[in-house]
């Protein structure tokens, strides 16, 4: 068994992690550390947390054998941990429940959050509605355009959504603005960070709340593959919360490979990607030391991914540590490969996965072919793809006017015009590097 005890008492994972914050936030961070230390092993707190997961979220989430995909790809059997079936449609709710419970015990009445794909924002707005807390969500304006269904969901749930116009107008900038809000309103405000980044204790705390994913898998997988665990566990990595959630309970199981899949965007050599662990260098970002995409002057560089949730120039410090000690591997999947996996999973298994999760599915399809049929791969399907349908339709050149909301405009005299009924098939993709892909991804590209 792999001996692993991280982080240390100061919040460091080797040389990574720590707490790099302004003096104005020092008291708030210390208050949070003390509160989490008090409640993280408190029986009453844990009982309430697991009750909420069971009765509000619907846990445990099932594991599904993607049998048709496995047959067609050949090689290893592919299994999916169905976090997309959670209430709100992703893994994010696991963490927001835990942090909101902590906020209430600390007497905080106002919650702020950052979001990229919108799933963390929706999960935060959801739990704030349940607990009667004020909710403000910061979201880059580019991501607001890409993820408009989730923006409306947040507003329906009573949250105030603040589009961020600074910088690249994506997740990094939303996090910056949320930090500024926290500094200005520290007395009554609790910041629910959505990933395993930020100053200590956030990376540890978010990991702990999300580790329910891997803990369930340890109990569930032997039912499918006998008295053993999968040969590989795969998850997409942006900030890295869904990956740490499934990796952490498996770290001790040395026989299981842990593989994180970063967004390679238009290719790792193109400069238009979000692969911090493969192309970044150690630096400080958003309160912790980790791998950061930066230029020769140490300035954070612009990132790109078709997936808003992976479009981030850093990564959680525990991932940086796992990479350095060799316990986890990190690879890249391009926009085009993720899109192909998105369509393939739809057509072979009837599952519409998030574009973030599709990166992990794409690598599982590659890896399975190199393995034996008696071996197994477990993929963390971190979220559902409802939020991405518009993006995928645009990228695929699909006729999206067939939406129910548009049918009344399209139909005259009871007859459906040919231009609305004979559009290109949803699954049609432009060739790799083709003009349709280049044009469609320009929304997320950086000038």
From Swiss-Prot:
Annotated metabolic or biological route of this protein: Amino-acid biosynthesis; L-tryptophan biosynthesis; L-tryptophan from chorismate: step 5/5
Pfam families associated with the record: PALP (PF00291)
PROSITE patterns for the chain: TRP_SYNTHASE_BETA
Any one cellular-component term (Gene Ontology): cytoplasm
Keywords for this protein: Amino-acid biosynthesis, Aromatic amino acid biosynthesis, Lyase, Pyridoxal phosphate, Tryptophan biosynthesis
Positions carrying N6-(pyridoxal phosphate)lysine: 92
InterPro entries registered for this protein in UniProt: Trp_synth_b_CS (IPR006653), Trp_synth_beta (IPR006654), Trp_synth_beta/beta-like (IPR023026), TrpB-like_PALP (IPR001926), TrpB-like_PALP_sf (IPR036052)
Keyword Transcription regulation: no
Region Disordered, residue ranges: 408-447
Reactions listed under catalytic activity: (1S,2R)-1-C-(indol-3-yl)glycerol 3-phosphate + L-serine = D-glyceraldehyde 3-phosphate + L-tryptophan + H2O
Cofactor(s) it depends on: pyridoxal 5'-phosphate
Gene Ontology molecular functions: tryptophan synthase activity
Database matches in CDD domains: Trp-synth_B (cd06446)
SUPFAM superfamilies: Tryptophan synthase beta subunit-like PLP-dependent enzymes (SSF53686)
Record's keyword annotation contains Amino-acid biosynthesis: yes
EC number: 4.2.1.20
PANTHER family: TRYPTOPHAN SYNTHASE, TRYPTOPHAN SYNTHASE-RELATED
HAMAP family: Trp_synth_beta
Task of the protein: The beta subunit is responsible for the synthesis of L-tryptophan from indole and L-serine.
Protein family membership: Belongs to the TrpB family.
Assembly and oligomerization: Tetramer of two alpha and two beta chains.
Name of the protein in its database record: Tryptophan synthase beta chain
